[in-house]
């Protein structure tokens, strides 16, 4: 049985690229859904269980930090990985302090590095 991933990002190109990054059928992971912001992600999670959330930080309506806080307030134990183009140390620290399990820079993403982060 594969682990279910929810991708939260407001950029359609990122969602398409994420799907095409690797042959997901050859991994223990399935991209089961996407959301365009934190609020959409919370609505998705009300109806669909997932094992891992990968989220961007900067989004309208509810950003990634807001999503992390909302999940932690609901005592969620779903691991959250931040996938962002921002390398600012303060943003990284804020995400990890809020409860993110990991932080990946979009510029550094490859199929191998993503799978390595997911395997942690």
Regions found by a protein language model. Name each.
Residues 3-14, 18-19, 53:
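Conserved acidic segment of CheY-like receiver
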Residues 4, 31, 49-51, 79:
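Structural signature of beta-strand start/N-cap positions in the alpha/beta core
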Residues 7, 34, 82-84:
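Conserved SAM-binding loop
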Residues 12-33:
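Two-component/phosphorelay signaling modules centered on CheY-like receiver
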Residues 19, 34-52:
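Acidic, metal-coordinating helix/loop segments flanking the phosphotransfer/catalytic sites
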Residues 26-36, 44, 92:
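Short hydrophobic/Thr-rich beta-strand motif most characteristic of the beta2 strand and flanking loop
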Residues 43, 51-120:
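CheY-like receiver
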